[in-house]
Swiss-Prot record:
It is found in: Cell membrane. A lipid is attached at C24 (S-diacylglycerol cysteine). It holds the Pfam family Germane. Belongs to the LpqB lipoprotein family. NCBIfam families: PRK13616.1 (NF010141). PROSITE patterns: PROKAR_LIPOPROTEIN. Its main location: membrane. This is Lipoprotein LpqB. Residues 1-23 form the signal peptide. InterPro entries: GerMN, Lipoprotein_LpqB, Lipoprotein_LpqB_C. It comes from Corynebacterium glutamicum (strain ATCC 13032 / DSM 20300 / JCM 1318 / BCRC 11384 / CCUG 27702 / LMG 3730 / NBRC 12168 / NCIMB 10025 / NRRL B-2784 / 534). It comes from the Bacteria.
């Protein structure tokens, strides 16, 4: 280990949290630690073609929409399609709407000198300040009036703001993660931002966004340790220069260094990185840093964590390895389990069992030493927090409950978590799963998929807020969900042609997964870093995630309809 890594490990010791407790109870202890500015892209070097001579009105409008993907010089490329008077009044910064596609229709009453064209499409998202994608699902309609100016068609009246087809967003913008710590200070959480591809200084854009703080959607679930006086000065003489960081102690400086280094590294900005705060090195003993120096905070480290496959079959749990199926001991082979989650690193099993017409959440070791944590009419499949520091389940379709072990008594403690649903969302929660960082929560309500943010209003308290529908195109077909280690959400559905889908965590994209030999419905889904597992109408199947489109039965479980459980 390098001298720098050794020193950094010493600095990070106060941030570490032990996740296992002694004794027969295996659930970890309950421990609670406790302005976005407007965004504009940097200049581009690419020359953008403007209107062509004698261009037809519909083609000119298409060219205008394509030019709207270039934010440089206050959208000068798009303004070239406007009449002289409209250029000074149109406000492109009012909004950026993302449409699945843009349809054009000329309205009656058009003449050789003036035309009005209707614009229609489904708005699938909005690109907010700072490159934040907000999913939407609404029909969009507007009108554009065109007039001849010096013999050429130009746009004379139009709504403020930019309209982009989704393909133009993907072609000209790339999502990057800006990293912030969860409230425990243990794990970096990505805050996804869509940034213009042709920026000359992507690194400076990212550092400015980092100092500006987390986006409103995720802000309640992460920590922003910088004061409002903090600012990013720029990249000068090979240094990333910041001011207003004088209030940060050594631990806070280390955390900010981790945020900056991993934000840059995951955007393919090469290191080493020199971070300067108020004229001096951010970390006094380490003027330059690499990702190796801050490997403890690698936000993708858990994507390569070794996982273990288990199967839930006929109400009993078994370990599956190299074609061998080994039943677990005791209560875990009792034949009454409906769903389960397992943490192999913490040796914790959480299972929902049926007993005397009740659902019972039982928690214990794999060896079978257990405690009953909850009883209710219904309990959803349990889900673990980051590092297995607690687990969650939803009782009776409406109340999330967090279960953790008391640090003082050693007993299981149940805490109801408030959930703030959008006003128009009603119905029971049938699935509820935490992301690997524990900061995001995905849920299914009446067959629709939603993602929210887990916040900590006070010691021991939890709240799920900022809940947004992320896959409206699936309608009400969702049946099962699972977070991949890389933050992609997998959704099993009842759609016959495409029963399995992947959804980006910000809702910016949804795509079907290979379905050649899958048979809907997909009632269970789980994933490791390398393999996706599902239960369809016939069997438990697996699909390697690397360039493969053939689902195969799991060795040892041929011809059986088991549910996959992947443990970390």
């Amino acid at each position: 280990m390098s001298k720098i890594s050794t020193k950094l490990k010493a600095l990070t010791a106060v941030l570490s949290v032990t996740t296992l407790v002694a004794g027969c109870s295996t659930l970890p202890q309950n421990t609670d630690p406790q302005v976005l500015r407007s965004f504009s892209g940097s200049q581009s070097t690419q020359e953008i073609a403007g209107p062509t001579p004698n261009q037809d009105p519909d083609l000119l409008i298409r060219g205008f929409f394509s030019a709207g993907a270039y934010p440089t010089q206050q959208y000068e490329a798009a303004k070239a399609y406007l009449t002289e008077g409209t250029r000074s009044t149109w406000n492109p910064a009012a909004s950026t709407r993302i449409l699945d596609r843009i349809d054009l229709n000329t309205l009656p009453g058009s003449t050789n000198a003036e035309r009005t064209i209707a614009i229609r499409g489904t708005q699938v998202g909005t690109l907010l300040s700072g490159g934040v994608y907000q999913p939407e699902n609404a029909e969009f309609e507007a009108e554009i009036t065109m007039r001849r100016e010096d013999g050429e068609w130009r746009i004379d009246a139009l709504p403020d703001g930019i309209l982009l087809e989704r393909n133009d967003l993907r072609n000209h913008y790339t999502p990057h993660d800006v990293y912030f710590f969860d409230p425990s200070g243990q794990v970096l959480v990505g805050d996804r931002r869509w940034l213009f591809n042709e920026s000359q200084s992507m690194s400076t854009v990212l550092m400015a966004l980092l100092v500006n703080g987390p986006s409103p959607a995720i802000s309640p679930g992460v920590v922003n340790q910088l004061s409002t006086d903090a600012s990013f000065v720029g990249f000068n003489d090979g240094e990333y220069q910041f001011t207003g960081l004088g209030n940060l102690d050594d631990d806070a400086r280390l955390r900010f260094a981790a945020q900056a280094v991993w934000t840059l590294a995951h955007a393919d900005v090469a290191g080493p990185y020199t971070l300067v705060a108020d004229g001096a090195p951010l970390l006094s003993e380490f003027p330059t840093l690499t990702t190796d120096d801050l490997a403890e905070y690698n936000p993708e480290a858990y994507t390569n964590t070794v996982s273990t496959l288990f199967a839930l079959q006929d109400g009993s749990l078994s370990r599956v390895s190299s074609g061998n199926v080994s039943p677990l001991q005791g209560i875990w082979s009792g034949g009454d389990i409906d769903s389960a989650a397992i943490s192999s690193s913490a040796n914790v099993v959480a299972a929902v069992r049926h007993e005397n017409n009740e659902a019972v959440l039982t928690v214990g070791s794999m060896e079978g030493v257990t405690s009953d944590a909850l009883r209710s009419e219904t309990i959803t499949r349990p889900t673990f927090e980051y590092a297995s520091s607690g687990l969650w389940a939803v009782v009776d379709g409406e109340t999330p409950v967090r279960v953790a072990r008391s640090a003082t008594t050693g007993e299981l403690v149940q805490t109801e978590a408030e959930i703030v649903l959008p006003r128009d969302v009603t119905g029971p929660i049938s699935e509820f799963q935490l992301s690997r960082t524990g900061v995001r929560a995905a849920m299914i309500i009446e067959g629709k998929v939603y993602v929210g943010v887990v916040t900590r209003p006070g010691p021991g308290e939890r709240r799920v807020t900022n809940i947004t529908e992320v896959a409206p195109s699936l309608g009400e077909a969702a049946l099962s969900i699972n977070w991949r280690p890389d933050g992609i959400l997998l959704v099993g559905t009842s759609i016959p042609e495409t029963p399995l889908w992947r959804v980006e965590q910000d809702g910016s994209a949804i795509s079907s997964m290979p379905s050649g030999n899958l048979s809907a419905p997909v009632v269970a889904v789980a994933s490791s870093a390398t393999t996706v597992y599902v239960t369809d109408s016939h069997a438990m199947l697996q699909l390697p995630t690397a360039d493969n489109d053939i689902w195969r039965e799991v060795p040892g479980l041929l011809g059986t309809r088991a549910a996959p459980v992947v443990a970390y």
